[in-house]
């Protein structure tokens, strides 16, 4: 599927993290998808925000998928007000 996507001359939407990009480190393996847009789910993924991954992530959005705030609090994660403007937030153009 990755090879077909790379050969297609069409825009690609990555869901959460583009295939081939490490969500934690941002390391890019071969082959890797070059998405025109990436829609991350629930929380930003550190690796997607790394400089080395930028050529593969395109425009970045974050989507609220309904995970309760209490779950984030139990994990020690705080993202106050990130979805105050709506369920999908643009992070980078």
Model regions: which residues?
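YjeF_N-associated NAD(P)HX repair module
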Residues: 1-93
């Amino acid at each position: 599927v990755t090879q077909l996507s790379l050969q297609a001359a069409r825009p690609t939407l990555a869901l959460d993290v583009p295939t081939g990009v490490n969500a934690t480190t941002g390391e890019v393996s071969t082959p890797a998808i070059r998405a025109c847009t990436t829609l991350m789910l629930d929380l930003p993924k550190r690796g997607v925000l790394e400089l080395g991954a930028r050529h593969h992530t395109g425009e970045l959005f974050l989507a609220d998928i309904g995970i309760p705030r209490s779950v984030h609090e139990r994990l020690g994660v705080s993202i106050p007000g990130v979805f105050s403007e709506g369920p999908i937030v643009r992070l980078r153009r």
